[in-house]
């Protein structure tokens, strides 16, 4: 019984093998034939599309206006150059339009092609109005994509790196904000022939990759879109504009400029607490702080374009410079009105005492010599003896002479001007900082959106 079952199983497996293997080969041949047929059909469609196609003529020539729908995907934004007033942006630039000459029928609805086909059909002659330099990436092949739908709608995408102008108004620098435009349109076709339209709304027509910001000194606040028409001697042209809104980060400038300026002003006010007679020390404080402020003002301007107006940082540095220079002038004023105490307070009193003692000693010596010379005669003459005794006897009621008071030394005296400066200078500088930072930090960013 078991032997019969094994025989039946072997026969069944042999039957399946003999039947399935030819069927598999037939299916493989059918799929291969279908692939070959698809390639053949694909080639025939392309050949038929290009048969008699003139890529020198725009779609709808003499009949309708060609509408080009555009949108931008930003893969990298930055860096931004303040000195050159320009920025660099890396984008996928997408254009979409309809060409009735490229309609087709076939087993597929979309033909996915590369850059080779793009050179054989009409494409918009788009250029960037404010672009200084534009590069189309060609590694390892030209980064271009072309898709043709069966109704003649084309999608043309390319990867570009654009270096564009960004006009900046630096009155509020470094608390400033800017709107950098990216303008593009047709170079040869006027609005009566080709017009551009944003594909989506503002948030979708221009998108920035989440990790696309390459900015060290700015925050990318967002973007907006616009459209305008410009007139020239050759006609009216459509110009599409995308604005990228930037707000400068102030941290770098606080560390590099603001804090050193504040510390320099505070250092200049330390001289008010030194003795007014300490001329060398106060002179070093004044001259050093003035030179430091000069160096800071020069270095702060190196990273900026040579504009003809003063920025917010320039005003801050100018006021700090005024405080430092005023401290030096204050010392000069105090020094001018300071009396030299060591020239008359101490030495003149000592010299007067020495002169007085010398005159007394001379008088005593003369008196002693006279007494010695006349002593024998005094002893002989009773009248002279009596007169001598009466002359040498001091008067009991004579009051001692008052000694002249020593002049008060003024070596460690403090000037009234210094006392006032210790209060006035810090209060004024603190008030200035309060008004300055409250004004600029609470101000809404003004984005100069050019038309």
From Swiss-Prot:
- Where does it reside? Postsynaptic cell membrane; Cell membrane; Cytoplasmic vesicle membrane; Cell projection, Dendrite
Binding positions for 4-aminobutanoate per the UniProt entry: 94, 157
The cysteines joined by S-S bonds are 166-180
Question: Which GO BP terms apply?
Answer: chloride transmembrane transport; gamma-aminobutyric acid signaling pathway; inhibitory synapse assembly; synaptic transmission, GABAergic
KW RNA-binding (keyword) present:
no
Q: What's the chief localization of this chain?
A: membrane
- Spans traversing the lipid bilayer: 250-270, 281-300, 312-332, 421-441
Signal peptide, first to last residue: 1-28
Cytoplasmic compartment segments: 271-280, 333-420
Write down the membrane topology.
Multi-pass membrane protein
Which residues are noted as glycosylation sites? 38, 138
What does its activity-regulation comment describe? Activated by pentobarbital. Inhibited by the antagonist bicuculline.
Q: Could you tell me the keywords of this UniProt record? A: Cell membrane, Cell projection, Chloride, Chloride channel, Cytoplasmic vesicle, Disease variant, Disulfide bond, Epilepsy, Glycoprotein, Ion channel, Ion transport, Ligand-gated ion channel, Membrane, Postsynaptic cell membrane, Receptor, Signal, Synapse, Transmembrane, Transmembrane helix, Transport
Outcome of mutating residue 292 to K: In DEE78; impaired GABA-gated chloride ion channel activity
Q: What is the effect of changing residue 335 to H?
A: In DEE78; uncertain significance
Gene Ontology cellular-component annotations: axon; chloride channel complex; dendrite membrane; GABA-A receptor complex; GABA-ergic synapse; inhibitory synapse; neuronal cell body; plasma membrane
The protein's PTM annotation reads: Glycosylated.
What reactions does this protein catalyze? chloride(in) = chloride(out)
Give the Extracellular compartment stretches of this protein: 29-249, 301-311, 442-451
User: Which disease appears in this protein's record?
Assistant: Developmental and epileptic encephalopathy 78: A form of epileptic encephalopathy, a heterogeneous group of severe early-onset epilepsies characterized by refractory seizures, neurodevelopmental impairment, and poor prognosis. Development is normal prior to seizure onset, after which cognitive and motor delays become apparent. DEE78 is an autosomal dominant form characterized by onset of refractory seizures in the first days or months of life. Clinical features include severe developmental delay, hypotonia, microcephaly, cortical visual impairment and profound intellectual disability.
What exactly does this protein do? Answer: Alpha subunit of the heteropentameric ligand-gated chloride channel gated by gamma-aminobutyric acid (GABA), a major inhibitory neurotransmitter in the brain. GABA-gated chloride channels, also named GABA(A) receptors (GABAAR), consist of five subunits arranged around a central pore and contain GABA active binding site(s) located at the alpha and beta subunit interfaces. When activated by GABA, GABAARs selectively allow the flow of chloride anions across the cell membrane down their electrochemical gradient.
Entry's family note: Belongs to the ligand-gated ion channel (TC 1.A.9) family. Gamma-aminobutyric acid receptor (TC 1.A.9.5) subfamily. GABRA2 sub-subfamily.
Regarding domains, what does the record say?
The extracellular domain contributes to synaptic contact formation.
Q: How does it assemble?
A: Heteropentamer, formed by a combination of alpha (GABRA1-6), beta (GABRB1-3), gamma (GABRG1-3), delta (GABRD), epsilon (GABRE), rho (GABRR1-3), pi (GABRP) and theta (GABRQ) subunits, each subunit exhibiting distinct physiological and pharmacological properties. Interacts with UBQLN1. Interacts with KIF21B. Interacts with LHFPL4. Interacts with SHISA7; interaction leads to the regulation of GABA(A) receptor trafficking, channel deactivation kinetics and pharmacology.
The protein, known as: Gamma-aminobutyric acid receptor subunit alpha-2
């Amino acid at each position: 019984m078991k032997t019969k079952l094994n025989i039946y199983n072997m026969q069944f497996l042999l039957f399946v093998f003999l039947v399935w293997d030819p069927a598999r080969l037939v299916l493989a041949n059918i799929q291969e034939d279908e692939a070959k047929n698809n390639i053949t059909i694909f080639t025939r469609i392309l050949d038929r599309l290009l048969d008699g196609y003139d890529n020198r003529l725009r779609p709808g020539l003499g009949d309708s206006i060609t509408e080009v729908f555009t949108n931008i995907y930003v893969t990298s934004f930055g860096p931004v150059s303040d000195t050159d007033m320009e920025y660099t942006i890396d984008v996928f630039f997408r254009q979409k339009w309809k060409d009735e000459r490229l309609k087709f029928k076939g087993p597929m609805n979309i033909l996915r092609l590369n850059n080779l086909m793009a050179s054989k059909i009409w494409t918009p002659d788009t250029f960037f109005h404010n672009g200084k330099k534009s590069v189309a990436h060609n590694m390892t092949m030209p980064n271009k994509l072309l898709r043709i739908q069966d109704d003649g709608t084309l999608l043309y995408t390319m990867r570009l790196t654009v270096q564009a102008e960004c006009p900046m108004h630096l009155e509020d620098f470094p608390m400033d904000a800017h709107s950098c435009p990216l303008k593009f349109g047709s170079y040869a076709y006027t609005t009566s022939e080709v017009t551009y339209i944003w594909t989506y709304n503002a948030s979708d027509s221009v998108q920035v990759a989440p990790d696309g910001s390459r900015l060290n000194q700015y925050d990318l606040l967002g973007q907006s879109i616009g459209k305008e028409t410009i007139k020239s001697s050759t006609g009216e042209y459509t110009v599409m504009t995308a604005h990228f809104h930037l707000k400068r980060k102030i941290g770098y400038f606080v560390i590099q400029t603001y804090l050193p300026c504040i510390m320099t002003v505070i250092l200049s006010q330390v001289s008010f607490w030194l003795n007014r007679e300490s001329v060398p020390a106060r002179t070093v404080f004044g001259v050093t702080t003035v030179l430091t402020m000069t160096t800071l003002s020069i270095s702060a301007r190196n990273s900026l374009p040579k504009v003809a107006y003063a920025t917010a940082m320039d005003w801050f540095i100018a006021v700090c410079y005024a405080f430092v220079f005023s401290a030096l002038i204050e010392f000069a004023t105090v020094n001018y009105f300071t009396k030299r105490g060591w020239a008359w307070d101490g030495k003149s009193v000592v010299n007067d005492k020495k002169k007085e003692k010398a005159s007394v000693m001379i008088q005593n010596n003369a008196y002693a010599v006279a007494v010695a010379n006349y002593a024998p005669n005094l002893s002989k003459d009773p009248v002279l003896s009596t007169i001598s005794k009466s002359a040498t006897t001091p008067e009991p009621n004579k009051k001692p002479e008052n000694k002249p008071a020593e002049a008060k030394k003024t070596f460690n005296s403090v000037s009234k001007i210094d006392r006032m400066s210790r209060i006035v200078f810090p209060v004024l500088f603190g008030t200035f900082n309060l008004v300055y930072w409250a004004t600029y930090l609470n101000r809404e960013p003004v984005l100069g959106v050019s038309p």
